[in-house]
Amino acid sequence: MSSSFKPTAVPAAGPRRAIVAGASLGGLLAARVCADHFDEVVVLDRDALPAVAERRKGAPQSVHAHGLISTGREILEGLFPGLTDSLVAQGAVLADAGLGSRRLIEGSYHARFEAGRLSLSVSRLLLEHEVRTRLLANPRVRIFARTEV
């Protein structure tokens, strides 16, 4: 199989900038990963971003309960060391994934069980705020609120 695609080397000279559209959780996590590979990361969001964990127009799902399953929690902890402890100190609940919740499947509650994996129950507001605060501690990252993309 032949291809006309020829990869080119990324120029080493000059600053490299990543631009991320959106400061919701997906954009914040993308910006965090980009910060490891770019000299500057700019995040643009149309909303005013609150200084505290409060509702914002661009994240209407923020009032719903959120669960961060074990693998996701571990990945976030790797990106932001100490995140889990900080969230728990602010009211999030860390529990065994099998013991900390009940499952209703096809009209029947299933028995709890020890899964050996820790999941986190946390408000979307708190999770997004804590991730944004930690991301802004990185001098390579800037977030511009009230900016149309």
Enumerate the language-model features and the residues they cover.
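Domain-scale detector for complete catalytic domains at protein termini or as standalone homologs
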Residues: S2-A13, H37, D85-S86, H110-A111
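N-terminal Rossmann-like FAD-binding beta1-loop-alpha1 element of flavoenzymes
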Residues: P7-A48
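N-terminal FAD cofactor-binding segment of flavoenzymes
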Residues: V33, H37, V52-R102
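A short, surface-exposed helix-loop junction/capping segment
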Residues: A53-E54, S108-A115
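N-terminal Rossmann-like dinucleotide/flavin-binding domain of flavoprotein oxidoreductases
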Residues: A65, L76, L127-R142
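Short beta-strand to alpha-helix junction loop
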Residues: G67-L68, E114-T133
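A conserved short coil-to-beta-strand element within the FAD-binding core of flavoproteins
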Residues: A145-V149
